[in-house]
């Protein structure tokens, strides 16, 4: 059976003190690193910040998403897109899924998901770029016939169209 190219990664979220009267802290996507394994855990805790790492995410490259990977790989800063949800009890955010496809991330956002992006580490960006180079073929543009080939009826307005 054909195996799809997959990389495992860990997502890091950070809670930082906010200088605001409406909120005392704010969460943000801090980074994505090669998978460290194990369970979600706190990796940094100070009076001003809390960082949690969430291991065990996979990004798999699919041929039908090749255009989305191409758009990402050819951008100035290739990124990992992470869908983030909020725990109903603690109200803390947690990463739900990750992708390298611009198009897939856009579909998630269209569906109401909160999606953040973070720069992909160099090896991950190179891996995606090599896959795109080997697998992505843009769809050929359909040539439009010049209007001169439509004949007189297609170029001239009909009596009732004036």
Feature names for model-found ranges:
Residues 124-136:
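Amphipathic alpha-helical interface segments used for dimerization/assembly
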Residues 1-119, 137-162:
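Terminal targeting/leader modules
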């Amino acid at each position: 059976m054909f195996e799809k190219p997959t990389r495992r990664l860990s997502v890091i979220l950070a809670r930082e003190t906010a200088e605001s009267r409406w909120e005392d802290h704010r969460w943000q996507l801090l980074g994505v690193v090669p998978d460290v394994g194990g369970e979600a855990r706190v990796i940094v805790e100070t009076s001003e910040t809390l960082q949690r790492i969430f291991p065990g995410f996979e990004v798999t490259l699919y041929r039908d998403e090749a255009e989305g990977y191409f758009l990402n790989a050819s951008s100035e800063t290739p990124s990992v897109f992470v869908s983030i949800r909020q725990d109903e009890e603690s109200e803390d955010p947690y990463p739900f899924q990750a992708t390298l496809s611009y198009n897939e991330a856009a579909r998630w956002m269209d569906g109401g998901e909160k999606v953040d992006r973070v720069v992909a580490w160099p090896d991950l960006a190179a891996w995606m770029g090599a896959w795109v180079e080997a697998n992505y073929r843009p769809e050929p543009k359909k040539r439009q016939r010049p209007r001169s080939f439509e004949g007189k009826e297609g170029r001239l307005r009909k009596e009732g169209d004036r």
